[in-house]
Amino acid sequence: MRLRAVLFDMDGTLLDTAPDFIAICQAMRAERDLPPIADKLIRDEISGGARAMVAATFSMNPEAPGFEAQRLEFLERYQRDCAVHSKLFDGMAELLTDIEKAHMVWGVVTNKPVRFAQPIMEKLGLAERSALLICPDHVTHSKPDPEPLILACKMLDLDPASVLFVGDDLRDIESGRDAGTKTAAVRYGYIHPDDNPNHWGADVVVDHPAELRKVLDNAVCSC
């Protein structure tokens, strides 16, 4: 079936948001007179959300006293500084342009709350180009449930089989597959060292956004 839309996960797929997360975590350590930790320790936990990143930042059990206060502080800081260093991954700008030139649409389906996702999209000039932005605020069940992808296809009035969903986590692939879309896993994203995208069951696995452009060359999802 002809490919008519490409939907992206946000963090680790469409956007490199790690620099903002890392800056906040390192600043929180510095203010507590703690030395910086390897950025990779934080980056590896991004897919696990604020809870996982704070736990890694302070080597702290989430059940420990004071953890929730640290997590809330992290979220407050991120609300203020969520779009300072974030940017499109290398090659993604060209991919988005190719999608638009092929008269297809693209959008974002993320587990990031809209209070963070919308400002980032606006700051990067992507909000007006994107056909939609689906966040947990818009659904009852987030990924890996298929509801966000089902909603996206319904909003676009497209058969899920004509949609490609791109993500850097198993939950993205599960959500897309269960919604009936084609799926692509990206190895350049925020993947935990213990995880392997080759085992997720995606229709295609890529190392760079440029590899997805091959799918657009003939506008047929042959993945």
Give the role of each language-model region.
Residues 35, 105, 182:
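Residue-level detector of anion-binding/catalytic polar loops
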Residues 88, 109, 141:
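Residue-level marker of regulatory loop/turn positions in helix-turn-helix DNA-binding domains and
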Residues 2-94, 100-102, 113-115, 123:
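N-terminal helical cap/lid subdomain that shapes the substrate entry/recognition surface
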Residues 1-4, 40, 97-100, 114, ...:
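Asp-based, Mg2+/Mn2+-dependent phosphohydrolase catalytic module
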Residues 46-47, 105, 165, 187:
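Short glycine/serine/threonine-biased micro-segments
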Residues 7-9, 109, 166-167:
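Generic enzyme active-site microenvironment
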Residues 16, 108-110, 185:
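Hydrophobic residues in well-ordered beta-strands that form the structural core
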